[in-house]
Curated annotation (Swiss-Prot):
Span list, region Disordered: 138-180
Protein name: Uncharacterized protein ORF180
Biased composition (Basic and acidic residues): 159-169
Compositional bias segments (type: Polar residues): 145-154
Length: 180
């Protein structure tokens, strides 16, 4: 335990040597807000490792801002018929989502190029699936119901490539276009 205290006191003395008086005053305020120098350093290391990390003080600051915004929106009438949209918890949630970059749906809505690329990819995949389906239909035997002399309703599989009539044999490879 004595080694731990010595470590922190040595660190504080080194910081005092290297920081200006104004920086030391700011550091002292941060230490007073967070409880100890150890908590401040652990938080700084965590933020250095993960820049998107929100500390408790960051979340509290977001909540305070959300409450102020909520109070302002409520005082000005809100502009929205639904009162639950102006709740501080909802505003805080939106502030935190904004701090983390927003939800994936919001990011897609904000990026028109990404939306356009997604629509193009969907159109291409639909066209490819349609083409593959039509080629498979033209090559594979298609079940076609025929009247059987035995019981009158037994379906048989007929090869569509052999059952083409002369009007559909004009080079379309058996693809039904709806014009026939």
């Amino acid at each position: 335990m004595a080694d731990k205290i010595t470590l922190w006191t040595d660190l504080v003395s080194e910081l005092r040597k290297k920081l200006t008086k104004k920086e030391m005053a700011t550091l002292q305020e941060i230490i007073d807000e967070n409880g100890s120098i150890e908590d401040v350093i652990v938080t700084l290391v965590r933020k250095a490792v993960n820049p998107d990390l929100l500390s408790i003080s960051d979340i509290e600051l977001c909540m305070q801002k959300a409450i102020k915004i909520g109070a302002y929106v409520t005082a000005t009438g809100g502009g929205s018929p639904r009162s639950n949209d102006n709740m501080p918890s909802q505003i805080a949630r939106e502030v935190v989502e904004e701090a983390y970059g927003g939800s994936p749906e919001q990011q897609q809505q904000q990026n028109p190029l990404q939306n356009m690329m997604k629509q193009m990819a969907d159109a291409i995949s639909t066209a490819i699936m349609s083409e593959v389906s039509s080629k498979l239909k033209s090559v594979m035997p298609v079940p076609m119901p025929q009247q059987n002399s035995d019981n009158g309703s037994t379906p048989h599989i007929v090869d569509s490539s052999k059952s083409k009539d002369k009007s559909s044999n004009d080079g379309d490879n058996g693809v039904f276009t709806g014009d026939e």
